[in-house]
Amino acid sequence: METMKDIKARFASAKEGEYNALFRHYENDERSGVQKLIQQYHKKLQALEDERVRTESMKKYEHEYEHLGYLCGIDEVGRGPLAGPVVACAVILPKDCDILWLNDSKKLTAKKREELYDVILERAVSVGIGMASPERIDEINILQATYEAMRQAVSRLSVQPQLLLNDAVTIPEIQLPQVPIIKGDAKSVSIAAASIVAKVTRDRMMEEYDKVLPEYGFASNKGYGSAAHIEALKKYGPSPIHRKTFITHFV
């Protein structure tokens, strides 16, 4: 008789399409551990099916405009922080994209974002990233700097899209049709993918800044105005990556 360890290993190494055969194989095994394992994987299968339904509901705009050709999702991260750049990302996903768990990056754990970042970069038709520095933000204001980063992201795509799906904004000075979608990062897989890549890109930058400017806690606060960050700002003064126009109340 197979041990529980062996059976767990079989389930763990099985592909999704093999689960039903394993369920049938072990359905008459009366050991409670085996039956609990079967229930566990039944729940896993149901969760995957539920996620496919949810993901499909986020392809409404992609299906509506797919006749136009390449669709590009655009989103930004970092409009609100006191320090660091604003980062924008443009992502063109393939029409048959089957990536699961895409969502507004704020609704995902850091671990899940990192996993999806790799999958998106591997499967996307093209990805472009743009950013505006703290100095540029101070020079032209955060809204204009965000638009500039978005235009930069689009310009860095290796393929020209026929339509832009934007999270809530219409980007000026860009010669492509645009569809602004309120809360688009939760309604469009393309925008969600852009949200995730932008978030991971910026978070990694802030973690690197933390290594040379550890007193501000950038690895944890990512430049946002946490109580500890504001306290450090008052104690040490602004760093080279602080946005001067954002910190006038604190220094």
Question: Model regions: which residues?
Answer:
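RNase H-like, Mg2+-dependent phosphodiesterase core
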Residues: M1-C72, R79-V251
